[in-house]
């Protein structure tokens, strides 16, 4: 018992990753499919998690629970498959995920969750998604900070061009950046980073909707896009970019990034990790 207590106390210090025996690195050849899995929605305001598909997001034909290890179960994760299509080192620009006609009630569901500061959590290759920020409080010493997940949306304000005060805006376009590492000691590439940069775009197009072949007029332009307001029922087009970046970080060190997560998230992340360490003693 004394040993367990000492380990627990040591583990509640800000830490991020944990390693479960039997979890081995996966090597992906160029062009091979990489699964992007959706997880829960969480908020530090409510502490009440929701399943990802509790909101009217794009869904695959068959939604399946795909939790892979005990750690995910202990964290209360609700991991499911997704409709996103990614291939190792194959980049995408403004790829259409789906188009949905949302009712006033569905728009309000999104808006309420945004008001409650809900964040979306995804998983790729057993890594949770993260959003990167640069803290420039001290201009001469900028600090990179990561937050787990990414914001579902934001509330409009006078400081945000093209928005109305108090109206909710949905982050329907996502830049997915995956960092990979290669080495002579193995074939293919290993995933060592998974970042999301969300944005809100009211997409437009000419002519009839042609599913994935539709040419969106709101992609690739130099002019600022209009954010997608949730103030009335209507069309929502979900899109995403995929970017691949080589990294010197090795697979065994890929969790080090999560040492830079924000203070509020460090607290809960550390407690859960500590409990798992004690259980595995």
Spans of features found by a protein language model:
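Bacterial N-terminal signal peptides that target proteins for export
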Residues: 1-5
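Soluble extramembrane domains flanking the early transmembrane region of eukaryotic membrane proteins
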Residues: 6-271
